[in-house]
Amino acid sequence: MEFSWLETRWARPFYLAFVFCLALGLLQAIKLYLRRQRLLRDLRPFPAPPTHWFLGHQKFIQDDNMEKLEEIIEKYPRAFPFWIGPFQAFFCIYDPDYAKTLLSRTDPKSQYLQKFSPPLLGKGLAALDGPKWFQHRRLLTPGFHFNILKAYIEVMAHSVKMMLDKWEKICSTQDTSVEVYEHINSMSLDIIMKCAFSKETNCQTNSTHDPYAKAIFELSKIIFHRLYSLLYHSDIIFKLSPQGYRFQKLSRVLNQYTDTIIQERKKSLQAGVKQDNTPKRKYQDFLDIVLSAKDESGSSFSDIDVHSEVSTFLLAGHDTLAASISWILYCLALNPEHQERCREEVRGILGDGSSITWDQLGEMSYTTMCIKETCRLIPAVPSISRDLSKPLTFPDGCTLPAGITVVLSIWGLHHNPAVWKNPKVFDPLRFSQENSDQRHPYAYLPFSAGSRNCIGQEFAMIELKVTIALILLHFRVTPDPTRPLTFPNHFILKPKNGMYLHLKKLSEC
């Protein structure tokens, strides 16, 4: 049978394309095979839990059950190799000496994990490395001086009181548990928008969720789903998927929102508007700080830098603090004796809570211990990661080669029975001055440590203290046993299906 002219004409190009694709696939398969062999060789000295040949250890994290990690920690008290699929492995550590060794260096953050973050964070302090990170850190540090932070206390208190007014109305109309995380999330967004932009969002008074908050929450879910879905690790496959399309759309929403506010402020400054002298501005917001920051040579942030740093402040400050506040309330609800002791302390310092000052926050010693113990028990950011730029040798002599991604499990460190006695027990006295002085300096790392520790940790502690103090002055919180909580293994530990607590208005206030 003879081939037609058309069949003959197209046969050769199709054949060549087939051979090319086959060769490309073969090269990729060889590359992946060699990568797996290298990882197996590098991680062989370290014992690990049994792993599935294809899925690796994914089941430990896909079940949203942090208790499985605790079981591993009891068996492997320092570290273990962690596989996601057959070709990607991390080295997970949760020992204070191991943590100190890692964080005392200047290894860059994991590029593999960084690609899962929203694009608008790609140039901010949280993602930068090397000289540019150092320059940004130096320029931003004055913005977190206590003289700047003091002015935020009144802003925070105002937003918290708006939330408490909502709770009072709810409690007067129903005798059921309240989903508090939604309210705390909106309140935290309200605070961060005011501190970042001096922007009134009305997100607490609106019956519908703020579009910005909705975009942030949905992005977080997409990032988590992509991280633990092997197919979506490919940038091409992810971008062509419905989730990838949604990811890009949500990122554009956030970019446009931030850009609009920045451009409005720059136009005002160029027009000579002295915003600090207007009645609504009693403080210097974060955007002011970023726009006015200059180093010794007079260099300032570029437009992209301004956008990235403001976005980082918004995202890092909103989500993590909403989660932390919620978990503190949850722990105090489960431990009423500690809740009552905190309330008595706050009453003795604040009275009716009509005003709150920097010095008063410093007097809340027991409340601070309860906040720290919650951040140990349920760290809002459960892990951080680094790509080793050179070989790393731990104090016990074990060595990792350059190129390995090391994940410091803060959850694992804070629940390591070799580090903490009875780690699942809520015990604020762990953070008394005496006990803190005796503890390993790298045993408690809710804000990381070393040169890359969280630049906003003082801001965070102020918001946590102000919020918890005012809530305890006006409400007693008790758990809802019909709605147990789980700890989903996300980038940020947030209540998976909301947080329901019983709220009782206190008549004394």
Swiss-Prot record:
Expressing tissues: Expressed in brain, heart, kidney and skin and, at lower levels, in skeletal muscle and liver. In the brain, high levels are detected in amygdala and lower levels in globus pallidus and cerebellum. In the heart, very high levels in aorta, but very low levels in other heart regions. Also expressed in breast, prostate and colon.
Record's subcellular location? Endoplasmic reticulum membrane; Microsome membrane
Against SUPFAM superfamilies, the record matches this protein to: Cytochrome P450
Main EC class the enzyme belongs to:
oxidoreductase
List UniProt keywords, sorted A-Z: Endoplasmic reticulum, Heme, Iron, Lipid metabolism, Membrane, Metal-binding, Microsome, Monooxygenase, Oxidoreductase, Transmembrane, Transmembrane helix
Q: Which GO terms describe its biological process?
A: lipid metabolic process
Q: Which positions bind heme?
A: 454
Q: What is its EC number?
A: 1.14.14.-
Q: A Pfam family for this UniProt protein?
A: p450
| Topology relative to the membrane | Single-pass membrane protein
InterPro entries associated with the record: Cyt_P450 (IPR001128), Cyt_P450_CS (IPR017972), Cyt_P450_E_grp-I (IPR002401), Cyt_P450_sf (IPR036396), Cytochrome_P450_Monoox (IPR050196)
Q: What PROSITE patterns has UniProt attached to this entry?
A: CYTOCHROME_P450
One Gene Ontology term of the molecular function aspect: heme binding
Residues that span the membrane, as ranges:
14-34
**Catalysed reactions listed for this entry:** N-(5Z,8Z,11Z,14Z-eicosatetraenoyl)-ethanolamine + reduced [NADPH--hemoprotein reductase] + O2 = N-(14,15-epoxy-5Z,8Z,11Z-eicosatrienoyl)-ethanolamine + oxidized [NADPH--hemoprotein reductase] + H2O + H(+)
Q: Which cofactor does it need?
A: heme
What GO CC annotations are associated with the protein?
endoplasmic reticulum membrane
Primary role: A cytochrome P450 monooxygenase that selectively catalyzes the epoxidation of the last double bond of the arachidonoyl moiety of anandamide, potentially modulating endocannabinoid signaling. Has no hydroxylase activity toward various fatty acids, steroids and prostaglandins. Mechanistically, uses molecular oxygen inserting one oxygen atom into a substrate, and reducing the second into a water molecule, with two electrons provided by NADPH via cytochrome P450 reductase (CPR; NADPH-ferrihemoprotein reductase).
Family of this protein: Belongs to the cytochrome P450 family.
Q: What is this protein called?
A: Cytochrome P450 4X1
Q: Which gene encodes it?
A: CYP4X1
